[in-house]
Amino acid sequence: MLTLKVFVYTVVTFFISLFLFGFLSNDPGRNPGRKEEG
């Protein structure tokens, strides 16, 4: 059961980090007045 719990926590953390990364990377792109990396 411990392996299952670790697997679930890993998947959840992976999805959360992926969502946060996508949100942060898309945020400056939606603002035309602010360009960071082009």
Swiss-Prot record:
It comes from the Eukaryota. GO terms for cellular component: chloroplast thylakoid membrane; photosystem II reaction center. Keywords: Chloroplast, Membrane, Photosynthesis, Photosystem II, Plastid, Reaction center, Thylakoid, Transmembrane, Transmembrane helix. GO terms for biological process: photosynthesis. InterPro entries: PSII_PsbI (IPR003686), PSII_PsbI_sf (IPR037271). It holds the Pfam family PsbI. The chain crosses the membrane at residues 4-24. Its main location: plastid. It is found in: Plastid, Chloroplast thylakoid membrane. It is a single-pass membrane protein. Belongs to the PsbI family. PSII is composed of 1 copy each of membrane proteins PsbA, PsbB, PsbC, PsbD, PsbE, PsbF, PsbH, PsbI, PsbJ, PsbK, PsbL, PsbM, PsbT, PsbX, PsbY, PsbZ, Psb30/Ycf12, at least 3 peripheral proteins of the oxygen-evolving complex and a large number of cofactors. It forms dimeric complexes. PANTHER family: PHOTOSYSTEM II REACTION CENTER PROTEIN I. One of the components of the core complex of photosystem II (PSII), required for its stability and/or assembly. PSII is a light-driven water:plastoquinone oxidoreductase that uses light energy to abstract electrons from H(2)O, generating O(2) and a proton gradient subsequently used for ATP formation. It consists of a core antenna complex that captures photons, and an electron transfer chain that converts photonic excitation into a charge separation. HAMAP family: PSII_PsbI. This is Photosystem II reaction center protein I. The lineage of its organism: Eukaryota, Viridiplantae, Streptophyta, Embryophyta, Tracheophyta. The gene is psbI.
